[in-house]
């Protein structure tokens, strides 16, 4: 699987749901907690096309978006190919990487 980064805060239920889904898929990820970290949140927003909500999920260089976006990929059967480096459709409306 390719590298996965997820920006979170401690008490965010959507962050916990995203981590549960990724863990259920057997995906290893790096969690970046931006609780009380203005620089970390600014870095996240810069990478996430201005989005400031958490979670923000990146699979390789692909910005997936938040939990709803991750769940939509799973529902459409596109999450496993993305996690395995076979992104043909692009995530979050972006171009395929």
What is each PLM-predicted segment?
Residues 59-88:
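Non-catalytic, surface beta->alpha helical segment in thiol-disulfide oxidoreductase systems
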Residues 16, 39, 65:
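Residues that form or flank phosphate/diphosphate-binding pockets in enzymes
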Residues 90-97:
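Short acidic DE-rich linear segments
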Residues 20-22, 45, 70-73:
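Short, glycine/charged-enriched secondary-structure capping and boundary segments
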Residues 1-30:
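Local sequence-structure signature of Cys/Sec-based thiol-disulfide redox active-site neighborhoods
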Residues 49-58, 68:
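Structural micro-motif
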Residues 30-32, 62:
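Structural signal for short hydrophobic segments within the conserved structured cores
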């Amino acid at each position: 699987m390719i590298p996965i980064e997820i920006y979170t805060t401690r008490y965010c239920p959507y962050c916990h749901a995203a981590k549960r889904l990724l863990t259920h898929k057997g995906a290893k990820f790096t969690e970046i907690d931006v609780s009380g970290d203005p620089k970390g949140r600014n870095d996240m927003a810069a990478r996430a096309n201005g989005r400031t909500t958490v979670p923000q999920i990146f699979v390789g260089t692909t910005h997936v978006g938040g939990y709803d976006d991750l769940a939509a990929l799973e529902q459409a059967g596109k999450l496993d190919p993305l996690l395995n480096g076979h992104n043909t459709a692009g995530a979050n409306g972006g171009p395929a990487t």
